[in-house]
Amino acid sequence: MKLVIQPLLKSGVNIMEQKHNGIIFTAIPDKSNEYYRPFYEDLIYFNEYLNENKSFTDQLVSLSVEEQDFHTSFFEYDDIWLRDVAPVVTNHLVKFKYQPNYLPKDHWRYLDQQFNKWLKKNDFEYVKSPLILDGGNLIWNKKDTVIVTERIFDDNDDWTEEEIIEQLEWDLDVSRVIIIPAEEGDVLAHADGMVKFIDEHTMFISDFLGDHEFRYNVQEVIQEQMPEAKFIVVPSSYTEKGQYDQEIASAKGLYINMLETCDAIYVPKFGLPKDREVLRYIQQHTEKQAIQIHVGEISTMGGAINCLTWYCPDHLLPSKMKRLNNQNEDFSVRKIFDWF
């Protein structure tokens, strides 16, 4: 018992009085969904594992039509990739148009409409942008800079490049928008598979599977607008073995796709020999707690921990969710399920 209590006392954490700093949202599709059916048990395990291993200051809520052993928001959202459809978080929330060219029109329209209904139902306040942008294609340094890939130009080809950048600056309230090249052949072309800010000027950057020329090119593009930028190369252990979707490359072994909250960085765990080494490496470069979350089989569908989640800090949550967020962990799961 002493071994458990002493570290908590030293860090000043009182479990009974712990206030959460934000909510991590996930989504669980219906069991009948043919595309996700082979991964249903993996998705439940992912949520259970995340719930059991998350930071004391984080809460987990999953959009689901079934009760689970973790907190749920009763809502039908028949997909798992929340990051791309959800509002982008800067100093406020910004909801971009969700119209990915890698999905059929009826599919993305349904997902966008459903998620908008959920946002409205729960009284989220956000700015609407006229631009098309997946949430996974925007990285913010928590101050004045965002990074997106050049995919945004293709998705908004009725705008000039200058107009797009000006609109992003206005919507996001930033002074610097850095456009980086997308990886060749990457259907998604998301920045969250390439870079990750860990402070105002320092970022993790993928090793791009040993493609040094491309990595140097990305770094040069960033430093042209951000001369003070520093880079920490995150190793990968990519394997296409078991890739599920012929059109979308597996993300297994791509550790750069991390989720950051106020007090923690959640690192993908793939069941690969390099998992532990990468976790130690990440922990060496952040003062936040690095927590590894298993996404092994799920990642073969083309995404990892950041793609699967949407984190909203407490100050941007609607009031009724703040009430949930400040409840103790022993608050009734059934009560929470009924709230939303």
Residue ranges and their predicted role:
Residues 1-340:
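Histidine/cysteine-enriched polar flanking segments
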